[in-house]
């Protein structure tokens, strides 16, 4: 009886250790829940890898959703892959592919909140994929073949994660910088790139800000009075 009891205790201890280890170890760790981070996470999970996405906000989709730039550029004759799945979900929601053509900048336009909802639905069905929202990477180390990341949670607690593979899904290259990868800011000169359209001298110019607005037709004039100090010429393109 004593041996049986000791055996049960040992089995419980091993099970507890294994479960604890699985909580802080993943095959693939993705920092950033933008469109690239989400799709990388979905594909990784579908290939059987235990995957974790760490995202600073409540949203998924990055530029396509939380930034409001919900207009997809590209070749619309390539409807396959994860983008194809995302587009089909949009078409199902809005009533067909033609319903996505609501602007002149893209053939795939949608409300940011709808895109966020669809990304969450696509993530939720993947059993090998977890998402930590309101979480921020605060420290990153590399020991032999393992990445060790310290993640600050919403309640300010720190969780340590071990991962075999690390993916930068921040859209700004934040993790690449943290890893010491060399980078440039701005536009390279034509002498660096051998491109005729490049400037003669390199500069620190970055892409201009994009103002995004979702418009609704109320069927009547609902124009508000001009605010004090408003000058429309300041917003002319």
What residue ranges belong to the model's regions?
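Core beta-strand elements of the Rossmann-like FAD/NAD(P) dinucleotide-binding domain
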Residues: 26, 155-165
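Conserved N-terminal/central alpha/beta ligand/cofactor-binding core
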Residues: 43, 49-50, 55-139, 143, ...
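Short hydrophobic core segments
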Residues: 161-171, 175
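Rossmann-like dinucleotide-binding core of oxidoreductases
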Residues: 177-237
């Amino acid at each position: 009886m004593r041996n049986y009891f000791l055996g049960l205790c040992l089995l419980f201890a091993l099970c507890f250790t294994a479960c604890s280890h699985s909580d802080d170890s993943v095959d693939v760790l993705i920092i950033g829940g933008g469109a690239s981070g989400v799709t990388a996470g979905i594909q990784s999970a579908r290939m059987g890898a235990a995957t974790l996405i760490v995202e600073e906000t409540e949203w998924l989709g990055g530029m396509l959703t939380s930034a409001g730039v919900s207009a997809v550029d590209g070749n619309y004759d390539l409807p396959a892959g994860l983008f194809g799945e995302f587009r089909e979900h949009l078409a199902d929601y809005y009533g067909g592919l033609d319903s996505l053509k609501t602007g002149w900048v893209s053939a795939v336009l949608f409300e940011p909140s709808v895109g966020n909802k669809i990304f969450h639905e696509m993530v939720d069905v993947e059993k090998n994929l977890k998402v930590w929202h309101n979480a921020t990477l605060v420290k990153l180390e590399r020991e032999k073949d393992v990445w060790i990341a310290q993640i600050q949670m919403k309640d300010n607690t720190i969780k340590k994660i071990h991962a075999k593979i690390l993916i930068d899904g921040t859209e700004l290259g934040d993790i690449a910088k943290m890893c010491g990868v060399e980078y440039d800011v701005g536009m390279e000169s034509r002498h660096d790139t051998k491109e005729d359209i490049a400037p003669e001298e390199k500069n620190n110019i970055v892409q201009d800000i994009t103002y995004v607005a979702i418009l609704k037709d109320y069927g009547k004039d609902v124009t508000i009075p001009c605010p004090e100090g408003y000058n429309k010429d300041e917003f002319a393109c």
